[in-house]
């Protein structure tokens, strides 16, 4: 078994790496937009941005390959550590009940499940991140086309149009494209893929172990802030064979995307033997779902609702940091004085906005008792240089 906290943060190190990739892509696009000039000659400007478009795809693919190589070993170790942790917890329960379970490393079946889960997750990551090369081209084309349209309309100066284009690509960030056509931000897709992959793989290993040892009952973990559909069965006992008096696998949606072990699910299970003490009482489970979190406006909410609000604050902070990083990159690659002044003004504006957003999040966390999650606020291209500049601008 893995705890909800372990599953919640298992993808953090992988996301850190892919966040660096996202910022590298955003900076690359911002730099290319800045290098194309200010549209004094539309024909020349179009030729320049088409030339940049031609090299953008290959450069993004090179960046993806670089980060994929770095994440492969990290992901392998993550799966191995998760598998060992999950089976050691379960095996202690089996031993306490007179059984002799196999450790992960000596069980061919468990190792095969671990390897299959790792390869599936790694394959999904590779396929998804490769689509960022195409999506980056789309972002670049859309931003340049909109800039040209704005400038040609006469309602915007060329400098304003290009500054807006740089802001647009930063706000969009890097995104992946699924076969269905659905789009997701890169960090969102990575977190979902890794968390789901780890959860499903350790769940399958625990299930295989239970079946081999003849254990029919499993207790499901519980945590505050569970989505409402999962709160209905968390902390309960499930029968693998469908015994009466217990939840069945279909009751918990096992094998479905929005059920137990589905997308982003932080629940796990572990062996339970009739007559053993339960980890969660009915009262304790009720308290996990209570509306006992007070917002600054005095309204009461569940922890799930409060955490969703916290995630919204964090997304806004990351977007602002990406915009500052993109402005910083463009400022380092410009010679047009008017555009420089415009981007300097934008940098000052977003520096103040960042300070305000961080203050709002800190106040919200302090009032609700939630802990700030710095890993969800960080935009990894927003390094020391733009951070120091933002602070300096804010203190002027």
Predicted feature locations:
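N-terminal leader/targeting and assembly helices and adjacent pre-domain segments
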Residues: 1-164, 284-396
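Generic detector of intrinsically disordered, low-complexity, polar/charged segments
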Residues: 34, 40, 170, 178, ...
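Short, exposed beta-strand "edge-strand" segments with a Pro/Gly-rich flavor and a Y/T-containing core
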Residues: 65-69, 178-184, 267-270
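Acidic, glycine-rich two-metal-ion catalytic cores of nucleic acid-processing enzymes
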Residues: 184-287
């Amino acid at each position: 078994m893995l705890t909800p906290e372990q599953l919640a943060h298992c993808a953090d190190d992988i996301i850190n790496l892919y966040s660096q990739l996202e910022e590298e892509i955003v900076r690359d696009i911002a730099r290319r937009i800045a290098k194309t000039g200010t549209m004094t000659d539309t024909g020349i400007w179009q030729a320049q941005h088409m030339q940049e478009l031609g090299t953008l795809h290959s450069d993004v693919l090179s960046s993806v390959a670089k980060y994929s190589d770095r994440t492969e070993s990290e992901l392998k170790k993550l799966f191995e550590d998760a598998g060992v942790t999950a089976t050691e917890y379960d095996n202690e329960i089996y031993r306490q009940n007179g059984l002799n379970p196999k450790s992960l490393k000596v069980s061919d079946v468990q190792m095969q499940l671990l390897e299959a889960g790792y390869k599936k997750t790694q394959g999904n990551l590779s396929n998804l991140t490769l689509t960022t090369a195409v999506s980056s081209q789309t972002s670049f084309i859309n931003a340049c086309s909109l800039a040209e349209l704005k400038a040609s309309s006469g309602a915007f100066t060329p400098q304003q149009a290009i500054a807006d284009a740089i802001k647009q690509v930063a706000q969009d960030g890097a995104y992946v494209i699924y076969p269905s056509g659905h789009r997701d931000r890169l960090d969102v897709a990575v977190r979902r893929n890794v968390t789901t992959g780890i959860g499903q793989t350790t769940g399958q290993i625990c299930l295989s172990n239970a079946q081999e040892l003849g254990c029919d009952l499993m207790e499901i973990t519980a945590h505050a802030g569970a989505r409402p559909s999962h709160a209905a069965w968390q902390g309960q006992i499930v029968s693998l064979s469908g015994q009466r008096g217990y939840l069945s696998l279909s009751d918990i949606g096992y094998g479905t995307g929005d059920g137990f072990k589905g997308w982003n699910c932080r629940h796990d299970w572990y062996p339970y033997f009739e007559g053993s003490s339960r980890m969660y009482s009915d009262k304790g489970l009720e308290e996990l779902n209570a509306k006992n979190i007070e917002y600054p406006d005095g309204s009461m909410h569940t922890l799930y609702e409060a955490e969703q609000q916290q995630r919204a604050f964090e997304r806004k902070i990351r977007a602002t940091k990406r915009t500052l990083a993109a402005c910083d990159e463009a400022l380092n690659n410009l010679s047009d004085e008017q555009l420089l002044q415009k981007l300097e003004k934008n940098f000052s504006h977003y520096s103040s906005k960042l300070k305000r957003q961080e203050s709002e999040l800190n106040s919200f966390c302090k009032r609700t008792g939630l802990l700030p999650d710095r890993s969800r606020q960080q935009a990894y291209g927003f390094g020391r240089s733009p951070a120091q500049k933002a602070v300096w601008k804010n203190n002027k």
